[in-house]
Amino acid sequence: MRIERVDDTTVKLFITYSDIEARGFSREDLWTNRKRGEEFFWSMMDEINEEEDFVVEGPLWIQVHAFEKGVEVTISKSKNEEAMNMSDEDANEQFEEQVNELLANTLENEESIEDLFEQRAQQQKHSHKSEQKQTKQRPNIRTVIVKFDDLEQVISYAYHHNLSTDEFEDLLYMNDNKYYYAIHFDESVSQEMINDSYSQMLEFAYPTDKTEVYLNDYAKIIMSHNVTAQVRRYFPDTVE
């Protein structure tokens, strides 16, 4: 499980289904068994608290997005002063109610995991619509961006991913000692392949809210055109 501290009140995590199974849960547990789903969310909160000191204080806002390879969860604490003064018991009860509501809504939804992922892709597309107007118009180009915490993660991805993306334009940026990898898929690639590629990239990297506009303005391009092949050329595999 990868945990990213967004700010003082928000954490984001991505956990693969294989990792979920290693923790004693199944993929079906999350969407068809409310009791097991609750156990899973509470176990995640315990681990987040242990690693990031993210204590349940007041109500939380939870967003869950299902991907083909796993689940992305964003958890935010309330910034409302009155809510922050809730007792621990009331806060826990409200959090449990939110988890129950979240699971209930999921169980009532007959759409598949793939449908939910497609919705997520559409949400991202709409959220970046205003920023896309500022970029140079490139017909039918769709961009995927992920973040690596260090160079070792970049190298690991370059050697061990199984994506056929070498024919597409790609860029490796650096900003604040973090690495951002962008792939521009052209019109020959289906949305399903893009979705699958993104979920596989998240096995090595993290989601990011940084856009291409932001990276072009504030980050430095350190590699371009067949980035993974260049990384393999200049750096040995760190995992033998």
From Swiss-Prot:
Any one GO molecular-function label of the UniProt entry: protein-macromolecule adaptor activity
Signal peptide segment: none
Source species, domain of life: Bacteria
Cited Pfam families: MecA
Disulphide bridges, residue numbers: none
Residue numbers spanned by region Disordered: 118-138
Family statement drawn from the similarity comment of this UniProt entry: Belongs to the MecA family.
UniProt note: domains: The N-terminal domain probably binds unfolded/aggregated proteins; the C-terminal domain interacts with ClpC.
HAMAP family with a match to the protein in the record: MecA
Task performed by this protein: Enables the recognition and targeting of unfolded and aggregated proteins to the ClpC protease or to other proteins involved in proteolysis.
The protein's assembly and partners: Homodimer.
Name the record gives this protein: Adapter protein MecA
